[in-house]
Amino acid sequence: MKFNKIILHCSDSDIPAHDNVQVIRSWHLQRGWNDIGYHYYINYFGDIFPGRNISRQGAHCKNHNKDSLGICYGGASGPNVKQLLAMKRIIHAGHILLDIPLNEVYGHYHFNSGKTCPNFDVDKINWRRGAY
């Protein structure tokens, strides 16, 4: 896969039992998908879990799955500091390893006006600043 952008998402649930990559995967399988739609999942503690293999097209943003890396954090109320730092780590790795430009980071809402996901203003974050 050749990715040219990153799209950020949230699970839209603050229920602790939902903060699990396997729960998200099962939700997506119940929808008839063949796997979790996101390439990475970040839990409340900032732990990063692999989702759909990056060699496969995601299923996270209609009309943009072919060229985007999908990252989802657990929660509905905006990411905490640990989750933001984890996002930055993935974004910087995507830039270094996959040649994704750092100015090509979007929220799901950028591509679907009916969405607020990832429930924070992606444009206010300086993704170029160091992740560590």
Regions found by a protein language model. Name each.
Residues 21-28:
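Short Gly/aromatic-enriched secondary-structure transition segments
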Residues 1-11, 15, 44-48, 53-54, ...:
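Basic/polar, cationic surfaces and motifs that engage anionic cell-wall
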Residues 59-62:
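Short, surface-exposed beta-strand/loop micro-motifs that present aromatic residues
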Residues 33-34:
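Short solvent-exposed loop/turn micro-motifs enriched in small/polar/acidic residues
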